[in-house]
């Protein structure tokens, strides 16, 4: 069994969760903070049999896509600076962990 821990932009998380659930892959969403742009991120905890891990990763990769956004230059500093800059947002970060023991009550 594997545990996929993935951090996904909130703009993509609902469609990723829906697609995983439609394939009968269980997923738990944990709101998380971090990053400096957009509405935020969510951390998904996905427990899967090893045979389903490639399918789960494919779904995440197809739906949590990186994209470009234009934001004010200096957006992350306390004093905004004039001008706009293009940055990359979205995508995902995933950790795949081996599970030695699992219990469900």
Task: Identify the function of each model-found stretch.
Residues 1-105:
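Positively charged, small/polar-rich N-terminal and surface patches that mediate targeting and assembly
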């Amino acid at each position: 069994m594997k545990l996929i821990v993935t951090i996904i932009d909130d703009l993509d998380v609902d469609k990723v969760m829906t697609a995983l659930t439609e394939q009968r892959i269980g997923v738990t969403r944990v709101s998380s903070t971090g990053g400096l742009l957009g509405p935020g991120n969510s951390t998904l905890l996905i427990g899967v049999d090893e045979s389903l891990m490639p399918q789960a990763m494919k779904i995440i990769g197809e739906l949590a896509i990186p994209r470009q956004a234009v934001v004010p230059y200096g957006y992350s500093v306390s004093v905004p600076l004039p001008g706009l800059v293009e940055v990359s947002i979205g995508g995902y970060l995933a950790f795949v962990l081996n599970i030695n023991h699992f219990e469900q009550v």
